[in-house]
Amino acid sequence: MLKYNIRGENIEVTEPIRDYVEKKIDKLERYFTETPDANVHVNLKVYSDKNAKVEVTIPLPNLVLRAEETSGDLYASIDLIVDKLERQIRKHKTKVNRKFRDKGAERDYFAYSDVNGSTPPEENEGDFDLEIVRTKQFSLKPMDSEEAVLQMNLLGHSFYVYTDAETNGTNIVYSRKDGKYGLIETN
C-alpha cells in the first residue's frame, strides 16, 4: 500500500491537489504483482515566476524511484513526473527480466500485461542476485569536500568517495544534473 507524504512550499496542498497526486501515482501500482508498501514523498514548490516544481521519491525494496519536473502548470508537472516514473519502472523491469531470462529463470518481480490485459502463466522464480561485474579497492584519503570535487573532476567521475579531514567520516561528493555538486555525509 502506498502512503503519501505531500508537502508544499509556497503553496497550500489542497484536497483536490492531494487527490490528483494520489490518483496519478496510484497508476504506477499496475506495474507490480503486489502493491508495494512504500512511503511516497512528494514536494510541491511554486516559485515567484509562477513555475511549479514537483519532486517525487518512492523508496522500494529493490529500487528507488525519483523524478523531478518543473513547468508553468502544477498539474502538468505532476503528469510529467508520472511519465518519468513509468519510464524508470519499465527500464528497470526490462533489465531485471532480461537478467533472469539470460540465467534461464525469470522472476515475477513486476506485473506483466499484454495489450489485451492478460497475464502470462506462472513462471519459475530464480534467486534474486544482481551480478557485480567489477570490484575496486582503494584507500580513502583525508580531505575536505572542495578537494574531493577537484579529484572527482580530475578523474572524470560523477561521484567521489573520501574521508572527511575534520569529522573522519566517509563522505561522497557527486555531480548534479544542474551542474552543481552534492554531498552525502555518512554516520
UniProtKB/Swiss-Prot annotation:
Q: Where is coiled-coil annotated? A: none
Q: What induces it?
A: Transcribed early in log-phase growth, peaks at log to stationary phase transition. Repressed by growth in the presence of glucose, which also decreases 100S ribosome content. Induced by growth in ethanol, NaCl, and 46 degrees Celsius; stress respones are under control of the sigma-B factor (sigB).
Molecular function (GO) terms listed? ribosomal small subunit binding
> Which CDD domains does the annotation name?
RaiA
A cellular component term (GO) from this record?
cytosolic small ribosomal subunit
InterPro entries according to UniProt: HPF/YfiA_ribosome-assoc (IPR050574), HPF_long/plastid (IPR034694), RHF-like (IPR036567), RHF/RaiA (IPR003489), Ribosom_S30AE_C (IPR032528), Ribosom_S30AE_C_sf (IPR038416)
Q: Where in the cell is it found?
A: Cytoplasm
Q: Is RNA-binding tagged as a keyword? A: no
Q: What does the subunit comment say?
A: Interacts with 100S ribosomes.
Q: Per the similarity annotation, which family is this?
A: Belongs to the HPF/YfiA ribosome-associated protein family. Long HPF subfamily.
**Protein name as annotated:** Ribosome hibernation promotion factor
In its UniProt entry, the species of origin is given as Listeria monocytogenes serotype 1/2a (strain 10403S)
**What gene name does this entry carry?**
hpf
